[in-house]
Amino acid sequence: MAGLFFKPGLLPWYARNPPGWSQLFLGTVCKGDFTRVIATKCQKGQKSQKKPSHLGPLDGSWQERLADVVTPLWRLSYEEQLKVKFAAQKKILQRLESYIQMLNGVSVTTAVPKSERLSCLLHPIIPSPVINGYRNKSTFSVNRGPDGNPKTVGFYLGTWRDGNMVCVQSNHLKNIPEKHSQVAQYYEVFLRQSPLEPCLVFHEGGYWRELTVRTNSQGHTMAIITFHPQNLSQEEFHVQKEIVKEFFIRGPGAACDLTSLYFQESTMTRCSHQQSPYQLLFGEPYIFEELLSLKIRISPDAFFQINTAGAEMLYRTVGELTGVNSDTILLDICCGTGVIGLSLSQHTSRVLGIELVEQAVEDARWTAAFNGITNSEFHTGRAEKILPGLLKSKEDGQSIVAVVNPARAGLHYKVIQAIRNFRAIHTLVFVSCKLHGESTRNVIELCCPPDPAKKLLGEPFVLQQVVPVDLFPHTPHCELVLLFTR
């Protein structure tokens, strides 16, 4: 198979030494007793990393305890991290396959090459090109620190339920870039000189809330401050915006060299741009990224994979597995800023994207226009409402390849119904960052026998190949790219 982005061969692009490795760890496809190698646990003498269940007397500093929660694998070498992740993903797939086979009465997979008792072909994990400081987006909370200061900016330890919540500064975490930590530190400086209290619990009052920092590979930095207006007048509210603006333009915060500063007033835990518009206090309204030969526009509210270099590996993998051609319609569900579909647009007859966040759809349309892509269209709204009508409008007999990249909550069951029941979809690529819960249910309903009671009338899909892609070094998380056909 000739790759869309590479020379002919099966997923060959990661066969190189990750940073700091003395020799190549992963080859092409699993051969031999690979599981025995990757299933090796921590080396002798190394303590296993368990997530702290409380914040009572524990060994280690606050910083170490936060690292154990946010980046549980930080004490392992990156090579060992990949072994742990691969073993975990394989166990998930083994359980999933067993359940699907039980539902079908017989094995539902075809005679593809085996990979250590899996019916599907499990490829080796693709390592992240960047191991430390890889996050391009970080959200910092505001609450009481270990010293009791309520104007501490960082990440949480403990739980509200147990009454032991504490906010710990995060500049030591391996996955956070220095720039993000710098902006968080200066936001803390600003809070501690502000006469207004932070909003720790909504009903107890307070104003200043979390900080989000977004950066691109060129070093441009967007900061977004969330603020609870409480009972402030419009004039008082305007004064606070001017004060924080002055701090980051001409005050101590100027050291952050922000490209843009946004302000969002919010009386809810999480507000979209539609619910409460982001207000640009100064700078550029967007940041831009270069990925897969595309210039991509990113709005404050738009989803973009948090590891840019890893995202390129992920999207290349998706593109390779789709097998699209000039007669294919590519259906990109939960498309975000449209990168997957747009990167494949030159190889397909048409790209159809669906995304809930309006800002992300506007970014996708801008990216298409800027890059001269004319065979794409993007729709705003819930996929379960848009997809059935969109599929009905397409010509019979035209092949459709679907790519789904849902949030951790998975796909709505009506989306699964639409995919199952539209016979022109023969190939489906499913990207999952957390294959359990709703995502597991999605896979089962894609592969189970026809079930009129659930309105699953079309032929079942068959899981053919799985490629793990590590976008989250130092954490247990890993993206899985699953190829289904029927």
From Swiss-Prot:
It comes from the Eukaryota. One of its GO terms (biological process) is tRNA processing. The active site is at C433 (nucleophile), E479 (proton acceptor). Gene3D superfamilies: 2.40.50.1070, Vaccinia Virus protein VP39 (3.40.50.150). It is found in: Mitochondrion matrix. The keyword Transit peptide applies. Pfam families: tRNA_U5-meth_tr. It is an enzyme of class 2 (transferase). InterPro entries: SAM-dependent_MTases_sf, TRM2_met, TRM2B_chor, U5_MeTrfase_fam. Its main location: mitochondrion. GO terms for cellular component: mitochondrial matrix; mitochondrion. One of its GO terms (molecular function) is tRNA (uracil(54)-C5)-methyltransferase activity, S-adenosyl methionine-dependent. It catalyses: uridine(54) in tRNA + S-adenosyl-L-methionine = 5-methyluridine(54) in tRNA + S-adenosyl-L-homocysteine + H(+); a uridine in 12S rRNA + S-adenosyl-L-methionine = a 5-methyluridine in 12S rRNA + S-adenosyl-L-homocysteine + H(+). CDD domains: AdoMet_MTases. Its EC number is 2.1.1.35, 2.1.1.-. Keywords: Methyltransferase, Mitochondrion, rRNA processing, S-adenosyl-L-methionine, Transferase, Transit peptide, tRNA processing. S-adenosyl-L-methionine binds at Q305, E355, N405. Mitochondrial S-adenosyl-L-methionine-dependent methyltransferase that catalyzes the formation of 5-methyl-uridine in tRNAs and 12S rRNA. Catalyzes the methylation of uridine at position 54 (m5U54) in all tRNAs. Specifically methylates the uridine in position 429 of 12S rRNA (m5U429). Does not affect RNA stability or mitochondrial translation. Belongs to the class I-like SAM-binding methyltransferase superfamily. RNA M5U methyltransferase family. This is tRNA (uracil-5-)-methyltransferase homolog B.
